[in-house]
Amino acid sequence: MRDLKTYLSVAPVLSALWFGALAGLLIEINRFFPDALTFPFFS
């Protein structure tokens, strides 16, 4: 039961860190390439 409580307390923290990092990455991409539907360096 203690292991289950440890797992249930670790999973939200890891997911919050992951989604925070992903949101930050998307924000930085949109800062350098605003409104980019197609990236010019791929074509």
UniProtKB/Swiss-Prot annotation:
Please give the SUPFAM superfamilies that the UniProt record associates with this protein: Subunit IX of photosystem I reaction centre, PsaJ
The leader peptide range reads none
Bilayer topology reads: Single-pass membrane protein
Q: Cellular component GO terms, alphabetically? A: chloroplast thylakoid membrane; photosystem I
Q: Give the GO terms filed under biological process for this record.
A: photosynthesis
| Described purpose of this protein according to its UniProt entry | May help in the organization of the PsaE and PsaF subunits.
Under what name is this protein listed?
Photosystem I reaction center subunit IX
Q: Which organism is it from?
A: Oenothera argillicola
Q: What lineage is on file?
A: Eukaryota, Viridiplantae, Streptophyta, Embryophyta, Tracheophyta
